[in-house]
């Protein structure tokens, strides 16, 4: 599944209107090497970890304490980002008025649990 997160934390972390993530079950993923992890309190008030490439510093992944069985990858960092299509927009209450979301995605004012 792919989702767009419009929370202020993702906006600040990406320097963009939202972060586009492809979400996978953590058990189905293996990484070649270990990202550099940065732990913060997200817009939900819960801890999140953002993983960055240790070679170039590009943002790669996100792990949520609130959803320990999944891992998100920045969609544009994947080998074939066109393979994924957003199904959901999260934290739409934080979206900018000029951020035109796709009409056919599920919209949530808060996070996954809302």
Predicted regions and their residues:
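A short Gly-Trp-Pro
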Residues: 1-114
């Amino acid at each position: 599944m792919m989702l767009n997160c419009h929370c202020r934390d993702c906006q600040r972390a990406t320097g963009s209107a939202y972060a586009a993530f492809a979400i996978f079950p953590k058990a189905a993923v293996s990484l070649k090497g270990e990202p550099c992890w940065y732990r913060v309190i997200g817009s939900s008030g819960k801890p999140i970890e953002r993983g960055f490439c240790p070679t170039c510093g590009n943002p790669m992944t996100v792990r949520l304490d609130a959803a320990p069985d999944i891992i998100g990858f920045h969609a544009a960092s994947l080998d074939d980002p066109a393979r994924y299509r957003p199904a959901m927009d999260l934290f739409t209450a934080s979206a900018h008025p000029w951020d035109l979301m796709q009409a056919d995605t599920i919209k949530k004012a808060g996070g996954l649990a809302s």
